Amino acid sequence: MRADKSLSPFEIRVYRHYRIVHGTRVALAFLLTFLIIRLFTIPESTWPLVTMVVIMGPISFWGNVVPRAFERIGGTVLGSILGLIALQLELISLPLMLVWCAAAMFLCGWLALGKKPYQGLLIGVTLAIVVGSPTGEIDTALWRSGDVILGSLLAMLFTGIWPQRAFIHWRIQLAKSLTEYNRVYQSAFSPNLLERPRLESHLQKLLTDAVKMRGLIAPASKETRIPKSIYEGIQTINRNLVCMLELQINAYWATRPSHFVLLNAQKLRDTQHMMQQILLSFVHALYEGNPQPVFANTEKLNNAVEELRQLLNNHHDLKVVETPIYGYVWLNMETAHQLELLSNLICRALRK
């Protein structure tokens, strides 16, 4: 997919309510599968429905559909074979059949905690369905095996119809995170406040949302073929910005005298306003897929870093700077540097 594709208002609305969309997809898939079973009078008709729900339940982004499809179908076929062998062993020796099933379930558990959890899950589910057939009724076992494979194929078909794209979801979540960060930033350093605002819950939510985005990195990288290191870099900077914002708030409201000094510093106010505008440009770039406005921020951020560094040097020479003032100015300088890095990474993520 094109990384610089502009997001329409409809797409943004759909991805913001992806749980409703996914629930609707599963419901329609269940109804269509049920109608197919009734239309063709398929024996052991419970198992295609069970398999379809088990496979479609966890939401699959497009970057995971193909590899998970092979994992699930492979697990289903292997589970069917293991189950049929177990039924044959039961005719020879029940203890031998139990040992075989135990070994198969060990494989299921081992794979479930590895890199192929879906394959392990389907091996166990299919094995349980097949060996649940009455003793010696191979026809029933074969029908159940075929039903599980049918349910897997139908689930893959429905999952592949208008799938959720992790990269689009990642862009929307990052834009939302930066928007919320900008709001907290404005609230914390507003010149109209007389007391420190209570923003602890908002900061915690920002950090929690940043951590949740990590699950989108792998499928988004597969969809766009953008190196995971770029997503990881953006993830790290996003988390760093939230942590530094909390430290900035502490320094800004540390003491009343230092607060008034920072409040009346024109360069700092200009820097704050510039950072707010830059954050908005990031949000627009993520929604519109156009990194050009972000390129223009690099020079502004470089100038801001130099001005803040000069401000620190001037106060350092006078030896009258208080610790909160020095810390706040230094954190502003580091924030500007982090935004510069974020600007470069967003441009690379939205490349054509």
For every predicted segment, state its role.
Residues 240-247:
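A membrane-cytosol interface segment of integral membrane proteins
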Residues 1-23, 169-234, 247-352:
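Long, hydrophobic alpha-helical segments that serve as membrane-spanning/inserting helices
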Residues 1-210, 217-218, 222, 341-351:
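A transmembrane helix-and-boundary motif of multi-pass membrane transporters/channels
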